[in-house]
Amino acid sequence: MKKILISTGGTGGHVIPAQVLYDYLYKKNEVIIATDNRGLNYINKNLYKTKKIDVPKISKNILDFIPFIIFFTLSFLNSYFFLKQKKIKVLISTGGYMSIPTCLAARILKLKIFLFEPNLILGKANLFLLNYCNKIFTYSKSIINLPKKMKYKNFVIKPLIRKDIFLAKTKLVRKQKKFSILIIGGSQGAKKFDNLFKTDLIKLSKNFKIKLFHQTSSKNLKKLKKFYFENNIESKIFSYTNNLHKIIKKCDFIITRSGASTINELVFLEKPFLAIPFPFAKDDHQFHNAKHYVSKNFGWLVREGKFKQNFLYKFIRKLIKNKKLLLQKKKNMHNFVKRYDWKENSKKFQSLI
């Protein structure tokens, strides 16, 4: 039985893969997830063994440099002594600057280090840690920014999909009577989405029978509920939830940001989507994620800056009038994911580490 630490933190995009890896490995190994305060918000502590290791946020302000160095050193020492005390043999990092202190401590202790890159462009933290790792797990052979001399470390795996989503896929759901649209702002919510679509949604509701499911930030719930109520649009408004897949299954069409976990879950559940990447994502990784899957004809992609009034109305009107457009996307996704198998994926990953 190996002792494994999975290092993660920050947003759901880093934490969700960590949870999947935990579920793959915990039955035959002793596994712990190390995360920062933000990451703990996405983890059910009754299901996962966790260790909090807070890491200072990188700041461009020169006045923050000395506090950053002190806090970073404390994070490193915390990681080092925890790894040593628990006799950890394998470290898996799911990316982000939060994992750097733990990875450096693991390097000094000469542990096996495995990196995971969920995006189609290599993140800066993973790029920095490449020299120290045994392998880096990705979803593609063609990862942007992966140095040629490091390509031998790239090991392509199937997307890390949560077990509850595997189970949910086979369950039947009651079909909505109206054309159902889900708007996903991501684990952090997308305030821009709350305002970007309003005029078009009002117009759609007056011309077609539609139902809206809208995931937003908890701060904007009240305001958004008021908007839908005042415009007589049938809707369900909610903040971040671990059961989003249950809502996805009910819907005909998804409008979403394009974090790796979200896009992969939509593809697995065979739900056509319109991706609107977060324009300020690091290295524009959301655009590259969306572009990769749109090139496989699973959905559509539009830049937020090019999103004009009346675009969404015309786009969804076309989908409602011509169901074949959605059916073709669903067929393409079905052919892509039909060989996904939870037990097989788990067994394969066990053998890799």
Task: State each model region's role.
Residues 6-9, 27-71, 158, 218-220, ...:
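Conserved nucleotide-sugar phosphate-binding/catalytic loop shared by glycosyltransferases and other
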Residues 30, 38, 107-168:
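Active-site-proximal region of nucleotide-activated glycan assembly enzymes
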Residues 61-90, 108:
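An amphipathic, basic-hydrophobic alpha-helix
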Residues 300, 308-340:
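Conserved donor-nucleotide binding/catalytic region of nucleotide-linked donor-dependent transferases
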Residues 6-19, 191:
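A short, glycine/small-residue-rich beta-strand->loop->alpha-helix junction that serves as a flexible
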Residues 88-90, 233, 249-264, 271-272, ...:
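Acidic donor-binding loop of glycosyltransferase active sites
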Residues 19, 34, 39-46, 166-170, ...:
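Donor-nucleotide binding loops and adjacent catalytic segments primarily
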Residues 339-353:
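C-terminal alpha-helical cap of glycosyltransferases
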